[in-house]
Amino acid sequence: MGMSFGVQAAETIKVGIMHSLSGTMAISETPLKDVALMTIDEINAKGGVLGKKLEPVVVDPASNWPLFAEKARQLLSQDKVAVVFGCWTSVSRKSVLPVFEELNGLLFYPVQYEGEEMSPNVFYTGAAPNQQAIPAVEYLMSEDGGAAKRFFLLGTDYVYPRTTNKILRAFLHSKGVEDKDIEEVYTPFGHSDYQTIVAN
């Protein structure tokens, strides 16, 4: 996947940073924007990439899933970035995926995800359930982990928790755990009263 002629001829290489700086997800995504900017500063201090400085282009999709797609299109079509570092939730990634595939852009996705998706336009840098959730459950089922026999699968009500819990439920079934020993509960984004859920 090469850069367009306009990007190659420029004095700088534009790098898109697309993380929510406002809304529900800002608490998780703002630090990723900060780390990306710090890394760009460090790279530029060492001479840049191929002798060119990196130029960050920061957008705020504001924890609004459809706005992620609009901002992705803006970064690729108008701002002409060479690459984008962005998203956090799976729903935001799924929102931008058609845009990156249509415009042949490149997205670096920074966190774990539910798997069951591949695209030549995305670097999935986080763990999938078989690398993270299943080993954790295997440990909990082991003697060292407490030999757990019952499982409470709690998550925010969106793609990642639901898909991961579907995978975990199938894994638990394969280990002989019955449905009566698996409970799933989903909460909306921004939910904070977990005491009531845990007490049940």
What are these regions (language model features)?
Residues S22-M25, T39-I40, N44-G47, L76-D79, ...:
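Sec/Tat-exported extracytoplasmic proteins
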Residues A9-I27, F100-E101, L106-P110, E114-Y124, ...:
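Glycine/serine-rich loop-strand microenvironments at binding/catalytic pocket rims
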Residues A10, K33-P56, G146, H173-K180:
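Signal peptide-proximal N-terminal region
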Residues I27-D34, G47-E116, T125, T187-Q195:
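Beta-alpha junction/loop-to-helix N-cap segments that form part of ligand/metal-binding clefts
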Residues D34-L37, D41, R73, E138, ...:
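Core alpha-helical elements of the protein kinase catalytic domain
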Residues T12-P31, C87-W88, R150-T156:
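Short beta-strand segments enriched in small/hydrophobic residues
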Residues M1-K14, A45:
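Short, low-complexity disordered leader/linker segments with a strong preference
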Residues E70, N121-N200:
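Extracellular/periplasmic Venus flytrap/periplasmic-binding protein
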